[in-house]
Amino acid sequence: MQGEEEGLSRYRLRPPTPREERLVEGFLRAIGFKVNPYAEGMTVLDPGGKFKEVFYLPWGLRRAVERLPLHYSAGLNLGSIGERGFRPSLHLARELAPLCGSPVKCIRLSPRGEKLFLYSRDVYGDNIASHTSGAALVVGSNGQPLGWGVGLSRDGLLIVKPLRDLGWYLRRGG
């Protein structure tokens, strides 16, 4: 029983390291924030695998969660940290969608562009209603969040490359 408890002890939320804070803050700056709005409540779940999950847990809930013997998740899932850095979650996309345009950088797609994006395909030209360069929240023609992408321009052609889209749940996320 003691070995089992020790194995489960890794499922505890902890404060982020300075490196983890920098990765999340770097992403938030890239999409338009001047400061990290989640800095005071960021927590990390590091079960020892390839990825660490990053959550925002308001201070009012922190004491209640700390009393629990096991943490799987708590609060708003901001994303994960892996070998390639910080990867924002779809939960964060939904949370930030109302801030599209100010301060959050957004790319808006046409209905056809939405379909391409949700199949994790690059979106080009007329399928992009509004474009910005770099990492951005991608929304549909109705303003609903579709995921995260990168806006590019090559030889005058606008391109959106998906980073994570809602279709991911059907393809890989289970």
Swiss-Prot record:
GO terms for molecular function: RNA binding. Gene3D superfamilies: PUA domain (2.30.130.10). It comes from the Archaea. InterPro entries: NIP7_N, PUA_sf, UPF0113_PUA. Pfam families: pre-PUA_NIP7, UPF0113. Belongs to the UPF0113 family. This is UPF0113 protein APE_0516.1. It comes from Aeropyrum pernix (strain ATCC 700893 / DSM 11879 / JCM 9820 / NBRC 100138 / K1). The lineage of its organism: Archaea, Thermoproteota, Thermoprotei, Desulfurococcales, Desulfurococcaceae.
